[in-house]
Each structure stands twice: as C-alpha cells, then as structure tokens.
Amino acid sequence: MAIANNKKAFHDFFIEDRIEAGLVLEGWEVKAIRAARVQLKESYIYWKKDAFYLVGCHITALPTASTHIKPDAVRPRKLLLKQSEINKLIGKTERAGYTIVPLDLHFSRGKIKMEIGLAKGKKQHDKRQSMKEADWKREKQRLIKHTR
C-alpha cells in the first residue's frame, strides 16, 4: 500500500532500475507518515561518505508531537541498503546522466520502506512524446469503452 508517490520523478526521468530501501526514522516521523503527512515531490538522494541520504522529503509533524522534541521536517534521512545494492548504485551513478530518485513510500510487513529508482533524465522532446503516448492510451480506452 503506497503512502506517498513521486509522480514528478516519472515525468522527469526514465526509470531503469528499482530498489527497495529502508529508512532511519524518528518516532514522530513514523506517526506522521502513518497519517500520510509526507511529501516526496522535491526530494532527491545523494551519497555521503558511507551511505545514501534522502534530502528534501518533507514530513509534517502531527500537532500532538512531543513538546521537548523539536521536529525538523526536512532533515536528511539515512537509507538502509545492502552493500551489494550500494556498490551497484555507486557504479551506475558514476556514469554520466544517471541519478537516484525516490519513487514512493510504502509499508512492507509493517515497516516503512522507500522504493528508489536508478534514473536517467528526460529531454523536453522525450517528455512531450510521453505525454502524447499517455493521451493516445487514454483516447484508445475511451473509444473501446464507447464501442461496447
């Protein structure tokens, strides 16, 4: 079950590979995510020393959050990946044009997981072509529905 999707990632990038990663979260963040108070739109992932971090993901604290904790809505959050996955991602992102983007946030066996994608940026004409294909697909479904 998806909690939040990053639709902009599918519009701006060709997604070539997908990997599921865990997140290091605080208690108030878990409560806020369960209440779907999270936004992935402007978030991205970068490599720093020994791990990948999610930056720009906005998690709005619940109004009932503890008074002695100062919630930081956009703090960097560490991603939990296997060493083989880390090596694979580092190897592919070192090639020109590849980046890692967050695709969605979901539950997996009661844990909050993030699906990340190895992506290559789309040019403007690629975006237009994708929009034309989506319009044609929608029109085709409409025609099939009306001919029945």
From Swiss-Prot:
Residues 127-142 have a biased composition (Basic and acidic residues). Transmembrane segments: none annotated. It comes from Neisseria gonorrhoeae (strain ATCC 700825 / FA 1090). CDD domains: SmpB. GO terms for cellular component: cytosol. Gene3D superfamilies: 2.40.280.10. The lineage of its organism: Bacteria, Pseudomonadati, Pseudomonadota, Betaproteobacteria, Neisseriales. Required for rescue of stalled ribosomes mediated by trans-translation. Binds to transfer-messenger RNA (tmRNA), required for stable association of tmRNA with ribosomes. tmRNA and SmpB together mimic tRNA shape, replacing the anticodon stem-loop with SmpB. tmRNA is encoded by the ssrA gene; the 2 termini fold to resemble tRNA(Ala) and it encodes a 'tag peptide', a short internal open reading frame. During trans-translation Ala-aminoacylated tmRNA acts like a tRNA, entering the A-site of stalled ribosomes, displacing the stalled mRNA. This is SsrA-binding protein. HAMAP family: SmpB. Residues 119-148 are annotated as: Disordered. The keyword Nucleus does not apply. It comes from the Bacteria. InterPro entries: SmpB, SsrA-bd_prot, SsrA-bd_prot_CS.
